[in-house]
Amino acid sequence: MTKKMLNQNAKYDQRFLDKVEPKFEFSNKPINRLKIVKENSVQNKTGKEGRILRLKKKINSIEDCNLRNNSKNLVMGDGDINSPIMLIGEAPDEKEDLEAKTFCGDVGVLLNKMLLAIKIKREKVYSTYSINFRPPNDRKPTTQEIKRYSIFLKEHISIIDPKILILMGTTAMEAVTGLGNQISNERGNWKEIIIGNKTIPVIITFNPSYLIRYPDKKKFSWEDLKKIRKKVEDLNIII
């Protein structure tokens, strides 16, 4: 039989307690009614917004994770949740961890320019990361960490249900496709992955943070961007 918790501030009369049915259990702990309201609000939300909130709660409940324990915030995603284009980066850096947003600072400025170059506004796409928490000292996530978070990432992709996936960086490539090759050998070619019961076109390209460190690679990134623009047109995507 399920036990119920009764919250009382007064001291209990033991004679009364002895007469109470065993299905009741008494506690002096205060009830956090605000937390209950918030949890019920999350559970009651429907559609993509509700599913994302529930996924966020699941990720925030991960135990024994150094990434989660050493980060200030969980970085979930930004942009239009109904966008046909989903952009996946690697992991938050210090600024993104503080602001709980994707692609901030100089990285964000460059990403905006890259998308505008193919006539796409940043706010029209949905962006997230392969890893939702900042790795210590911005190190590369380990293979074990990538595998652990890829479960949540694929659920995230399934919720957004995009028509095109853009993977920026080796971590994103490994998390979504399982490929561990050099990104220079995989970038620029359209592939297909199956998430749930849907096949999604995927292209791998360099992360903007990498392009800031190695600007000579921008010429390859431009070739990838042109292929993305063509795919948008071929699929008659309005964005």
Name every feature range the model reports, one short phrase each.
Residues 1-15:
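Long terminal accessory regions outside catalytic cores
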Residues 12, 16-19, 24-239:
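A polyanion-binding, active-site-adjacent surface
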